[in-house]
């Protein structure tokens, strides 16, 4: 892990903390990923990609209030960040904040990502908005 390399001075190459965090997220090491993302953020403060990954890690460990705050931070620096609108929208819906969640899903769909992997997120947002329009409300978090 890059943290140990930095502490003990192993290797001459700079550590890519962002990439390290992404890899840690993939294998379910959410707390370790948070550490890597925080180190990456020190190198590039206000980086939307790093902040979004932090929000994802918070969500996965159940710290949804922190995830909401982090997504809001992303949007305060970068208002058009589609991924932050998507993540925030669904978190707000789970918290029972339907109007605000719906607004963020609509903002996500105004400028959705066009990558192949994003298609399922776009479809999920559209389906959710259709369900909301039919009066089917997601259950709030307990």
PLM region descriptions:
Residues 11-46:
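Alpha-helical segment of the N-proximal tetratricopeptide repeat
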